[in-house]
């Protein structure tokens, strides 16, 4: 201890002893010493840390004692040196290193580093579910419908006794696979987000292409010669409805669940699709001039096409009313 400090402390003690004889109560009492550090650490509480106290506790107590001594003897405060302990370990997080650290969990807890799975099995031995397949059987059938659109256009403009039959067969196969891929996806649980996106696109491409083909090259019968607009009006109604519903469903995908439920497929939409596919199949098949009662086939096909257009507009109105009620709430 420096001599000046010792002299100063000795004078303070003598003054305190002299004052004790004059006053019953001492006018000066030194500060209480800091609490002693227990020799053995206390056991951790239930649910607490499972690690024993480290040098951090001892270093903190030493720093507290040094600060109290500096205040007593009016020394300059000691420099705050960095204390190396358990809390000073680097965070493991998601950065480099990959070791275990403290993170933001507090002292005594370790952050678990999850290793990526290799060949479907994690490093800890737990099996991981396989990633979903992109090309399932329903998705392949849907892609086949999209690829059949150029083939349908090619056979429609071909000349020959087999051209009408080939065009009708392609469209009929597309209509059957439209039902088949949904059935397989539900029964075998093979549905994928990509397939759910591509299925309505394939349907609209096939229907729109067929309607445009029938309008650009109408059948040579008396009914269509007198009224060439008979095919144009339902074609515009059906295509316009499909474009509108595609935009509405795209908007509903960004809204809440109630809006999505409002645009779900209903029975009107199913009846519309059934009458639409039947009408287009009849109109494509009636292009074969060898078929008997060609005029009757064309008339029935046009009538079903108008029924399909009416159901399309009706279902669109129903969807819009549901959405409007939800928006007004």
Swiss-Prot record:
Residues 1-34 form a transit peptide. The keyword Lipid metabolism applies. Residues 32-44 have a biased composition (Pro residues). Its EC number is 2.7.8.41. It comes from the Eukaryota. Residues 319-329 are mitochondrial intermembrane. It is a multi-pass membrane protein. The chain crosses the membrane at residues 134-154, 156-176, 194-214, 228-248, 298-318. One of its GO terms (cellular component) is mitochondrial inner membrane. The keyword Lipid metabolism applies. It catalyses: a CDP-1,2-diacyl-sn-glycerol + a 1,2-diacyl-sn-glycero-3-phospho-(1'-sn-glycerol) = a cardiolipin + CMP + H(+). Its cofactor is Mn(2+). GO terms for molecular function: cardiolipin synthase (CMP-forming); CDP-diacylglycerol-glycerol-3-phosphate 3-phosphatidyltransferase activity. GO terms for biological process: glycerophospholipid biosynthetic process. Keywords: Lipid biosynthesis, Lipid metabolism, Membrane, Mitochondrion, Mitochondrion inner membrane, Phospholipid biosynthesis, Phospholipid metabolism, Transferase, Transit peptide, Transmembrane, Transmembrane helix. NCBIfam families: pgsA. Catalyzes the synthesis of cardiolipin (CL) (diphosphatidylglycerol) by specifically transferring a phosphatidyl group from CDP-diacylglycerol to phosphatidylglycerol (PG). CL is a key phospholipid in mitochondrial membranes and plays important roles in maintaining the functional integrity and dynamics of mitochondria under both optimal and stress conditions. Belongs to the CDP-alcohol phosphatidyltransferase class-I family. This is Cardiolipin synthase (CMP-forming). It comes from Oryza sativa subsp. japonica.
